[in-house]
């Protein structure tokens, strides 16, 4: 029997009570199968701990409220009060009584506003579709006003279920970049990830290669067909995991003219996950934080061990990723792949980034590539992982405050592309 809106709110109240008690193993039992495959108890525990640490610790999980006008699924917002502001748990309760979506959003409802360096009178945008079949994804093509032909970039967002703008709370860093670059006469194509557009269609053996290569290569082909785009000046611009994936995409299409890597992670991701968890645990120390780090370290050790097989259950692995995903990641070395490419590269890193760091990630790119004249590597000392400016000890709470990619980053990318 399917439940109505009142029943959906009852499910949400039970979910909220489990969140308050931090009973994450029981929470995942409420997930619909696609969500359960994508988000493990440990991944949820880590995300919850990150939000709690960034806001000074959770004080209370409040009464759920449904979004007006929705019947199936019912969108529900659950406010979480913290010592410093708070955040909102957003979920969708289906008529089957299960949770079909989940994200943690900052409080405040702040809307994105264009950065001062974007001028909407200087470009046009249109919707596009990349690929065919069940995992085809929608995107946006931004073209400068004028005949061109212009240099172009394909934007690649970071790890997770991101839309084409890499939206997170009030911020849209990829939209900042897209509008900033197209204002400066660079064509830009950005797209929703399949993990965002089709979370219920992902195969069990889905990998990072499946996540990034098909839409990115389709984007390059589409740009090459545009008369306003110079076909020999199409580049990839990847942020975070998008930067990690960019050399792999370029290796699959030698026509790609160059790479721009922003906070591209190079440390093996299972190791980085433990490092970041330790950073977050230090912000809100306690037995729960220690247990979270220890559990994640055990999962990471399994990823690194010969015992990892395609049949290893995802609940035993970090971040809820499948064994196939981890096996693919383990076999891929982004730095070695980049070293095998002949194309020019611009590698930028934020000095205040605690997710991808100068010591753990940029050093690997520098050791392999800094001697090459066609590779430029720069650190923006005041920038965090999103390349937003800031100061002091970096925390997740920064991501909840409205901000924009630093103008200097947009200008540096534009100048680098102009020289290609």
Tell me what each language-model feature is.
Residues 258-340:
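Accessory cap/linker subdomain of secreted extracellular hydrolases
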Residues 109-148:
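N-terminal cap/lid segment of alpha/beta-hydrolase-fold proteins
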Residues 205-227:
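Alpha/beta-hydrolase active-site loop
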Residues 354-360:
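Conserved alpha/beta-hydrolase "acid-adjacent" motif
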Residues 383-387, 391-420:
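Catalytic active-site module of serine/aspartate enzymes centered on a nucleophile-bearing elbow/loop
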Residues 341, 347-349:
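Short beta-strand/loop motif that positions the catalytic acidic residue
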Residues 9-10, 25-71:
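Short solvent-exposed beta->alpha transition segments
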Residues 146-180:
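Short, surface-exposed "cap/lid" segments of acyl-processing enzymes
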């Amino acid at each position: 029997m399917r439940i109505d809106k009142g029943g959906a709110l009852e499910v949400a109240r039970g979910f909220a009570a489990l969140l308050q008690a931090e009973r994450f193993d029981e929470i995942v039992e409420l997930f619909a199968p696609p969500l359960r495959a994508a988000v493990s108890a440990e991944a949820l525990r880590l995300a919850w701990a990150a939000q709690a640490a960034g806001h000074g610790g959770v004080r209370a999980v409040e009464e759920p409220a449904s979004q007006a006008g929705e019947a199936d699924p019912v969108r529900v917002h659950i406010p979480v009060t913290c010592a410093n502001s708070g955040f909102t748990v957003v979920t969708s309760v289906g008529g089957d009584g299960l949770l079909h979506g989940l994200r943690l959003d900052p409080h405040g409802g702040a809307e994105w506003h264009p950065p001062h360096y974007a001028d909407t009178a200087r470009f046009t945008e249109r919707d596009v579709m990349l690929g065919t079949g069940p995992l085809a994804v929608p995107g946006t093509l931004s073209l400068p006003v004028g005949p061109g032909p212009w240099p172009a970039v394909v934007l690649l967002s970071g790890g997770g279920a991101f839309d084409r703008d890499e939206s997170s709370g009030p911020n849209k860093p990829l939209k900042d970049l897209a509008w900033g670059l197209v204002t400066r006469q660079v064509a830009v194509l950005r797209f929703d990830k399949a993990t965002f557009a089709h979370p219920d269609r992902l195969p069990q053996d889905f990998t990072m290669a499946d996540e990034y290569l098909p839409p990115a290569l389709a984007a390059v082909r589409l740009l090459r067909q545009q008369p306003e785009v110079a076909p020999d000046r199409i580049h990839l611009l990847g942020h975070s995991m998008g930067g990690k994936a960019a050399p792999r995409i370029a290796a699959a299409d030698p026509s790609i003219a160059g790479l721009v890597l922003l906070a591209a992670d190079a440390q093996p991701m299972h190791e980085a996950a433990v490092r970041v968890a330790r950073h977050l645990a230090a912000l809100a120390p306690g037995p729960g934080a220690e247990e979270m780090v220890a559990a994640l370290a055990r999962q990471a050790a399994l990823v690194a061990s010969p015992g990892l097989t395609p049949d290893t259950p995802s609940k035993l692995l970090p971040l809820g990723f499948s064994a196939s995903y981890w096996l693919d990641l383990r076999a891929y070395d982004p730095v070695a792949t980049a070293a095998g490419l002949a194309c020019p590269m611009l590698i930028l890193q934020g000095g205040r980034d605690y997710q991808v760091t100068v010591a753990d990630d940029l050093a690997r790119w520098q050791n392999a590539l800094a001697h090459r004249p066609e590779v430029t590597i720069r650190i923006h000392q005041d920038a965090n992982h999103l390349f937003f400016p800031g100061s002091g000890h970096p925390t997740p709470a920064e991501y909840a405050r409205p901000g924009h990619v630093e103008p200097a980053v947009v200008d540096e990318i534009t100048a680098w592309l102009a020289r290609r």
